[in-house]
Amino acid sequence: MTMTLHTKASGMALLHQIQGNELEPLNRPQLKMPMERALGEVYVDNSKPAVFNYPEGAAYEFNAAAAAAAAGASAPVYGQSSITYGPGSEAAAFGANSLGAFPQLNSVSPSPLMLLHPPPHVSPFLHPHGHQVPYYLENEPSAYAVRDTGPPAFYRSNSDNRRQNGRERLSSSSEKGNMIMESAKETRYCAVCNDYASGYHYGVWSCEGCKAFFKRSIQGHNDYMCPATNQCTIDKNRRKSCQACRLRKCYEVGMMKGGIRKDRRGGRMLKHKRQRDDLEGRNEMGTSGDMRAANLWPSPLVIKHTKKNSPALSLTADQMVSALLDAEPPLIYSEYDPSRPFSEASMMGLLTNLADRELVHMINWAKRVPGFGDLNLHDQVHLLECAWLEILMIGLVWRSMEHPGKLLFAPNLLLDRNQGKCVEGMVEIFDMLLATSSRFRMMNLQGEEFVCLKSIILLNSGVYTFLSSTLKSLEEKDHIHRVLDKINDTLIHLMAKAGLTLQQQHRRLAQLLLILSHIRHMSNKGMEHLYNMKCKNVVPLYDLLLEMLDAHRLHAPASRMGVPPEEPSQSQLTTTSSTSAHSLQTYYIPPEAEGFPNTI
């Protein structure tokens, strides 16, 4: 029978009696536990009792309470949804401020209280049947024993908690990553017909049909004719209606032969690369120290020859000398008029006209130098553009050996230092040329040695390009180096043939090669002077000479030419290279037309 409470006083007295019966089994001596440190905030000070708010309108089971008191057992006296701790108690304030969502604590017993998870709004000491004191079991009168299977949230160690949280975060992040990857996958469409693209083909995203069509077009005949106005619509449904417009659109969207992705590699290429890397790794592991030291000086027998059938490499020293002597250009006469006095314009006009005509014969001479004709057209143009003024100057110095203090520009044009004063800045160049001619005369340079030195200048001029050069370097450097070695051997053969000792041969070879650096310095000075004359419009330059001057400025650093650095455009580079190549073919005179025997 349930009765409604009419007064708080009677209810409170009965409540204290019930609580005393419930706490009677727990009134044992306090558990003395060794404590490594002071109690933390999870334990409540027992000196501060909690305030219990009596619920209004709560129902009390008198019969059940009396029966429970007589039997000495505990029983629930209030419903689970009616008893709560007062919000004004210190225990409630502690739980709200420090532990957030954890249940509030009471400090009735002197024993430490664990953080429990009771059902909602239930007192820790008023539980349903079978759930009273869930985490402590009474085994002995003087001690408590911890249950083996405690609540996971409380009895899991910190490391386990961290691992579990890490696994949860990992799984959630992987799920998010998968969702992001799925959303990142976008559908590609063909740039030609707007169909679904199957991949990146010939430089654009395209479908299999357009890829195959473009492949057939570039490999076979593509002389398609449009039956209309060359403006047909190319889409998924009408791409086969007009082959001409389809091919036109392929080119418009950027399809090109060889337009593949640079980062793409086939399985066969990767397999070969792995095999090659494994083989190189085994070779490196098995190589000893003395073999590594021997590799610093590779034997000529193990050098890979790219020009195995080059006739220049099979020539003997005498044959090389004979070929170089036969390739020498003829002497050219100038347009000098002795009746007219020299002026700056007239002298520069004579010299530039003479140099322009000599350039034509220089191209034909270079074609007949052993080994030069085996190079590709790019390397031939590159070497001539770098060495043309050095070759003209060493020829001038060689002709002037028999005329001390004078320079023989042509058989009918012999100038001394005083005559060079009429041109601004010419005296310095004249002095350097006269000093080199005097050095040749002192060394008694022979004609065979001269032709070898001139060939070395041609082949060695563009081998070591400047870092600031805008043009690409030589493509067949190995072949050029082998031809240079052949010419050096020819020089040594000539010295040995003249009866010089080994020490004298080495000394003379070093002296001759040192003169080449002086000629390079004179060439740079002459190029700078010629460019300044061009900028001042002192004399108009001829086509081939002007082209060679501009090409030389592209090879050399701009700061050396005395002008601020200027980055040439791609069109200028292409025009210069193509024009120079055209000049090699235009000004090339076959040896048979000049009456020179072709010995190569």
Curated annotation (Swiss-Prot):
Give tissue specificity per the record: Expressed in the CA1 region of the hippocampus, expression decreases with age (at protein level). Expressed in the uterus (at protein level).
Basic and acidic residues composition bias: residue spans: 159-170
Post-translational modification, as annotated: Phosphorylated by cyclin A/CDK2 and CK1. Phosphorylation probably enhances transcriptional activity. Dephosphorylation at Ser-123 by PPP5C inhibits its transactivation activity. Phosphorylated by LMTK3 (in vitro). Ubiquitinated; regulated by LATS1 via DCAF1 it leads to ESR1 proteasomal degradation. Deubiquitinated by OTUB1. Ubiquitinated by STUB1/CHIP; in the CA1 hippocampal region following loss of endogenous circulating estradiol (17-beta-estradiol/E2). Ubiquitinated by UBR5, leading to its degradation: UBR5 specifically recognizes and binds ligand-bound ESR1 when it is not associated with coactivators (NCOAs). In presence of NCOAs, the UBR5-degron is not accessible, preventing its ubiquitination and degradation.
Q: Please give the residue ranges the record annotates as the region Mediates interaction with DNTTIP2.
A: 190-315
Q: Where is this region: Modulating (transactivation AF-1)?
A: 1-189
- Lipidation sites, kind S-palmitoyl cysteine, are 452
| Chain coiled-coil ranges | none
Per the record, where are the segments of Low complexity compositional bias? 569-581
Q: Which UniProt keywords apply?
A: Activator, Cell membrane, Cytoplasm, DNA-binding, Glycoprotein, Golgi apparatus, Lipid-binding, Lipoprotein, Membrane, Metal-binding, Methylation, Nucleus, Palmitate, Phosphoprotein, Receptor, Steroid-binding, Transcription, Transcription regulation, Ubl conjugation, Zinc, Zinc-finger
Which InterPro entries is this protein grouped with? Est_rcpt/est-rel_rcp (IPR024178), Estr_rcpt (IPR001292), Estr_rcpt_N (IPR046944), NHR-like_dom_sf (IPR035500), Nucl_hrmn_rcpt_lig-bd (IPR000536), Nuclear_hormone_rcpt_NR3 (IPR050200), Nuclear_hrmn_rcpt (IPR001723), Oestrogen-typ_rcpt_final_C_dom (IPR024736)
Q: Where are the annotated segments for Transactivation AF-2? A: 316-600
**Where Phosphoserine occurs, residue numbers?**
109, 111, 123, 172
| Domain comment quoted from the record | Composed of three domains: a modulating N-terminal domain, a DNA-binding domain and a C-terminal ligand-binding domain. The modulating domain, also known as A/B or AF-1 domain has a ligand-independent transactivation function. The C-terminus contains a ligand-dependent transactivation domain, also known as E/F or AF-2 domain which overlaps with the ligand binding domain. AF-1 and AF-2 activate transcription independently and synergistically and act in a promoter- and cell-specific manner.
Query: Which PANTHER family does this UniProt record tie to the protein?
Result: KNIRPS-RELATED PROTEIN-RELATED (PTHR48092)
Free-text function comment from the UniProt entry: Nuclear hormone receptor. The steroid hormones and their receptors are involved in the regulation of eukaryotic gene expression and affect cellular proliferation and differentiation in target tissues. Ligand-dependent nuclear transactivation involves either direct homodimer binding to a palindromic estrogen response element (ERE) sequence or association with other DNA-binding transcription factors, such as AP-1/c-Jun, c-Fos, ATF-2, Sp1 and Sp3, to mediate ERE-independent signaling.
Q: What is this protein called?
A: Estrogen receptor
Naturally occurring in which organism (per UniProt): Rattus norvegicus (Rat)
